[in-house]
Amino acid sequence: MSTLRQLTYLVALADYRNFRRAADAVNISQPTLSQQLRALEARLGVTLVERNESPVQLTPVGREVVARARKILVDVRDVEDMSARAGAGMSGTIRFGVTPTLGPYLMAGIVASLHRRFPDIRLYVREGIPDEQARELARGDLDMMLSPLPLSGSNLHIEPLFREPLHIVSPPEHRVAQAALVRREDLAGAGFLSMDRRHHAHRQVRDICTELGAELLEDYEGTSLDSLRQMCGSGLGFAILPELYLRSEVGGEDMVKRLALTDWSASRSIAAVWREGAAYTASYQTIADMIATAAHEILGVPMA
């Protein structure tokens, strides 16, 4: 019978595409890794790995086995977690992913509140690209994440929490910044800055530019909301910044001017995400509820 250990070794090889690096990742020798994978192939009666390729490639059936192995290993980890936490309540470490366009402006207070309410739990927060973190979540490298929608992925529970308003800001010396009320046609042809194209924010700004008849400045991609604000303040273009960032101590409007635009109601939907059937579902729901409550309080809107 194929063992969980052999499946772990196969997944490691799929991730690293190199026998030595995969062996190091699972703390065994390279010969042991090769021997165990050959034993797995013999047991299944198929070839899983094309060994003459560099980097190592999986056969078509190998890719299918890896996909199933990832799910098996995640399910086993959830069962082990459930057993370890039986009767323990909220405790342990939760690996939490969040987009950098949200985490720094919302999570600090939530983490502190969570630790006060549940002293035996630790929220390990890591920033990343939402679509990439969704894949990490699916394979068990993350336990929970906070992300703008839409989000792609299978076997994920998506819990919408709140809508965050988005605002157009301009260089303070630009002519439209002097107007008490800005019309959409005033922004036709204007250049808009955005995050790099891996972020939801890039796609949303692109769609808004299309709606306004504005131009997305492909040559200027920010790595953070701070960099967007600074580039905008320097006169490089307009930007679209979320409400929580503008309300935060690290953000604000000291370098830019928020525009009062007629007929403007752009926003983004924020959701908590975890694996369907995860052992800690009740804990994740508690954290999601705390995030929703905190966000609604900051934004000054009632819970639905």
PLM regions: where:
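A short LG(V/I)-centered, amphipathic sequence patch enriched
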Residues: 41-63
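Central regulatory/effector-binding core of bacterial HTH transcription factors
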Residues: 91-154, 222
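A late-sequence structural motif
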Residues: 106, 257-299
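Flexible hinge/capping segments at coil-to-helix
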Residues: 153-192, 197
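Beta-alpha-beta core module
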Residues: 154-160, 164, 179-180, 226-276
